[in-house]
């Protein structure tokens, strides 16, 4: 499919996940996709070889990594981003009383502060394109399950 001239950056595009599926869907619709992964070995092979797809290494917990991703997208798009999909996230399944506080902080950093940091960093490109943001969430907010209390409080 020819390019629409629109771009999307999706965090958390490791093989087999929702992000990889979203990246493939956007690519098929004609978007230039910036599919991000922390570990390049986990990038889906079908995306690595697809036209209009750029695999970016991005650790959403690192300000330096986020800044490097902004620079890469800016150079490739002329300073525009049409869609940002904050998809990175994680949960911990265990009783709250067994949760290590440091692990809980890391979970909260990943699920709350990281999407906010990515949004703030890409905001100028989104504003320039009159773009939009999609923040991936979970059914866990509506469907209580045992041993997910720490996940429920991290947006």
Identify the function of each model-found stretch.
Residues 2-34:
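Canonical Rossmann dinucleotide-binding motif of NAD(H)/NADP(H)-dependent dehydrogenases/reductases
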Residues 66-69, 85, 118-122, 126, ...:
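Hydrophobic positions on the long internal alpha-helix
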Residues 87-92:
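Conserved NAD(P)H cofactor-binding loop of Rossmann-fold oxidoreductase domains
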Residues 119, 154-155:
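Active-site helix of classical SDR
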